[in-house]
Swiss-Prot record:
Gene Ontology BP, a term: mRNA transcription
Alphabetical keyword list: Developmental protein, DNA-binding, Nucleus, Transcription, Transcription regulation
Pfam families in the record: ALOG_dom
N-terminal signal peptide: none
Main location per the UniProt record: nucleus
Protein's name in the database: Protein LIGHT-DEPENDENT SHORT HYPOCOTYLS 6
Annotated InterPro entries: ALOG, ALOG_dom
Domain of life: Eukaryota
A cellular component annotation (GO) from this entry: nucleus
Molecular function, one GO term: DNA binding
Organism this protein belongs to: Arabidopsis thaliana (Mouse-ear cress)
Domain ALOG: 31-158
UniProt subcellular location: Nucleus
Amino acid sequence: MESADSGRSDPVKGDDPGPSFVSSPPATPSRYESQKRRDWNTFLQYLKNHKPPLALSRCSGAHVIEFLKYLDQFGKTKVHVAACPYFGHQQPPSPCSCPLKQAWGSLDALIGRLRAAYEENGGRPDSNPFAARAVRIYLREVRESQAKARGIPYEKKKRKRPPTVTTVRVDVASSRQSDGDPCNVGAPSVAEAVPP
């Protein structure tokens, strides 16, 4: 005599392997996500090494600017000082002793990644030090000073506007009825359809 559940195995005894899931390897993060994580860890390390050590919750826009200035020592962009004979030259003919700094574009991208990382790690958007007005002003000043020093104007990208569509208004009362064609009633002439 066979029991009703003889085809089933007992999960308590362990002879049922259970549902089989094919585990896929964890998805590799995008280049942006990897860079954002590295930047975030670098900033946290900076706060840890700060004298005195600084908690993230007490971090302000001033600390972010201090961090950006600290990063200048690792920069690779030659920024001429006002007294340099090559100030304002894009392609100086010979080397000079002007400092290397972080390029404005690199700092701007870094702040964007850190702003996102701050909120992803539990920070409130209204207290985000990377979104502080002082940081935006600092970045604008860096952009303008580097543009002058390197002779490279930074211009905002102009948005392409969609082509304008010209509408033609047809006046039915002034349509041609002179040729007697009933199909031509209300149809504009070519001259009427083209705007002046």
